[in-house]
């Protein structure tokens, strides 16, 4: 027998190398085969409910890292709730209607307008479902636990029916109306857009300063006076029907030197405008308040059939332009709102494809709207005073990445103004993480206009509206309920397969259709109405879920998206929010803080990460970042996270190895019988349990990450485990000293494995497979630990905190001795502590082997007054380091005066000799194979 065989060197097959890319799919297959999601739900039956509602990602393409951040975050929350006494099902969903799918088919050469609509819609449906399958596999590869066999998809007939019921309820309350207000119009999509479908980019535009000649000055302005206006959208001059001034603003009539014309501009902008127009000097003829100019009539710059009225508007400012805004009610929200007050014509001169219409005039007809600036300049002639290129923020279609325009076309709207205050009241009842989300959503709802819900596309849920012969829109409860039932049985495809009369209730009549003829709406609903109805189609429809949901968790862009649309529909129908709490997260940027894009080549694919590092590394990254703000990720950052993971894994591997001979049923030592330092570690660990428990409840994953990393690296690796080896390796296998430490090891190992399961499920499942005495087959079926508190806990923590300060001081003294070549390793040291009475009292109170804790072979405690001049001194304490006396024990590696060669061929100290002689009699009898001496 070899001497080292008398040591209790921890043994385990648990590998240091994780090999996550290969092992994770094996664990996922095992979970699926064991039906773990179902079993966890069964375990939680009857417990308090926690229901997170999954905001549906769009079913198109593989997932990106933003999806991963979102789904992993949700999984962490649901897993932690499931293991903490809550019935917490997780039903994933997908958004499956909308333009992107039509665009994919168009790129494949499929022409919607040249084929049967029902056939086209079925192609859209099949493509969407194929993308659901693709993304489902991607999410499962991340280890997300969910009801994958029963997700919700917005194209499902049941969901479509419930969506129609939401629409019908809003219509019944009078919240649905038709209007011709200007809406965001995407010529590239040939459809109206909602605010949530808009993104802004900085672009360069040609702005024009031009003048309208006064036709009827109402006794205030002469007819040789010109009112100067400014536009950044020259094409809209074709539809200009008014000039808006600020009622309380001051306007001057000026006559430039050498000109026979006089011009009206805002007083506050005159100096800057004079420079732009080349007016070296001018004469001020008069001053007027904007309100004085109301109802003055001007000529259109070139259209002799059009007069433009001077009107008043509060939206006019002195920030730019001339203080006078040309007003085209068909091309702007402010223009429309102020124009309708004065009954201005709502002229629209651009068609759905962005081409100028016939009513724009023969010079413009058929031209693309963004290319007509030279024609406008030519038509203005000498009325043009200046032109310049400006850089400004402009709205774009978020899908096609093309600029959009405001365009007044007949659309269906959901009123928000009718119940806006009710929505705002509900926001104030909602909990927000982070708290600033409340103000953000509140302001968005407060300031938003009514919601345009119609779209001029094909792939979506039809607006269930019929028209009588006299044009009356029909959307009564009887009709919408009937359509909902048809959709539930057949899907919304039936809308396109049947005539209007076959979609109406049998025997339906209407006074507006004396001949019994009806037509149906051909527009579809905004896809935000789809997902915005999910509270009804999912949470209110499934028996194992509840409405309102406990939590909605999405990116911060959803304040204007899903959070917004869901809130509007829910309050409209039921008077309350669809959620009790909202958690929003920032965007995922690359390592430099830049937006990810294919063109930059900086996209991080979750699938690539899973192949290179493993999903648990991506999950640990999610826990490591502050998602209240934008977060960064790169392969380098993930490499750093992987290194942290390695430290955690190897620390837990040490605990596994050194509890391999520990049976918790027979070997556990009661807390009261633990050593002082073991009690301290038990208290510290339970504080960690409390911290993690609280952080899970607050959805603060980063706090968990920081606490775990600190505990593993500082409390365990750098302290407890550093000296624990000298006990668990060296003391007799069944000794009290060793079993005490193993008790703490095992307690930490089991509980931290449970605590980390929501974040690192693959790794903790692998650890759990080595814990043979734990009854649950999978750690996911276990319950979270509950933090304990102990007698005199605060006093114990205070004493050990003081010791940690002493330990740091001692390490500095040892380091100086090492640098002075007095010692090599700290075990070569004889450390003398010159202590004040206060420090002596502390060391006595610790009731511990201080030499063991400081990892020195010999320790002496002396009076502070006896400290030599060359001692390493601190307040109330000093240290002297000398080389320890004696020989190195071959077994304990400590220097001990009692170390000598024994009769059984072992060069060991008395303490090791006693352990050998009591526990290895055969080796003593036969002698050890070899000795270094």
UniProtKB/Swiss-Prot annotation:
Pfam families given in the database record: Anticodon_1, tRNA-synt_1
Keyword Aminoacyl-tRNA synthetase annotated: yes
GO biological process: isoleucyl-tRNA aminoacylation
Residue window of motif 'HIGH' region: 57-67
Cellular component, GO annotation: cytosol
Keyword field: Aminoacyl-tRNA synthetase, ATP-binding, Cytoplasm, Ligase, Nucleotide-binding, Protein biosynthesis
Record-level Gene Ontology MF annotations: aminoacyl-tRNA deacylase activity; ATP binding; isoleucine-tRNA ligase activity; tRNA binding
EC number: 6.1.1.5
Entry-linked InterPro entries: aa-tRNA-synth_I_CS, aa-tRNA-synth_Ia, Anticodon_Ile_BEm, Ile-tRNA-ligase, Ile-tRNA-ligase_type1, Ile-tRNA_ligase, M/V/L/I-tRNA-synth_anticd-bd, Rossmann-like_a/b/a_fold
Motif ('KMSKS' region): 595-599
Source superkingdom: Bacteria
Main subcellular location of this protein, as a coarse class: cytoplasm
Residues binding ATP: 598
Localization per record: Cytoplasm
Role of this protein: Catalyzes the attachment of isoleucine to tRNA(Ile). As IleRS can inadvertently accommodate and process structurally similar amino acids such as valine, to avoid such errors it has two additional distinct tRNA(Ile)-dependent editing activities. One activity is designated as 'pretransfer' editing and involves the hydrolysis of activated Val-AMP. The other activity is designated 'posttransfer' editing and involves deacylation of mischarged Val-tRNA(Ile).
NCBIfam families, per database record: ileS
Record remark on domains: IleRS has two distinct active sites: one for aminoacylation and one for editing. The misactivated valine is translocated from the active site to the editing site, which sterically excludes the correctly activated isoleucine. The single editing site contains two valyl binding pockets, one specific for each substrate (Val-AMP or Val-tRNA(Ile)).
Name under which the protein is recorded: Isoleucine--tRNA ligase
Species the sequence originates in: Streptococcus pyogenes serotype M18 (strain MGAS8232)
